[in-house]
């Protein structure tokens, strides 16, 4: 919440290991981990947003433009993940995690070189961020904050926007994983689509 980055990069690998230990079918382990990770961002994002709102850092015009695209992108991200095998998803997520680790380890930060585009351009950027976030099972902060910083948005506003935008990503992404996994015969008990309720409740 402090840095606008959710816990998906930690939650997803832990869930993958946990589901593997429980004997969940290998072909759905990663999908189940991604689908279970996203709903947690609704709760953490709301809590973080309240704090940023009280601090007066929330730019609702910018958030509405980003959020509209993120809703569409996150739904498509979940549908895309459903088309990929667990092994392919693992490779994609691993590459993303290494990229984030290198970025933080080398302290690579985008320079403010431009300004936010208009409503359409901002919405398209939101859709891309939402698509990738749902594909990786994260709230989007690791992409939203750098994108907004690159577009000369002050850091406090960028972090606040990231917290707010994690909720439409989490909502649309969760629904897409629920829909994609509905009725899958290999799901463990207490699953709703690709969302495993006991793990979700434990994380929240």
For each feature predicted by the language model, list its residue ranges.
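Juxtamembrane transmembrane-helix boundary motif
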Residues: 1-3, 10-31, 36, 45-136, ...
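Active-site pre-Tyr helix/loop in NAD(P)-dependent dehydrogenases
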Residues: 164
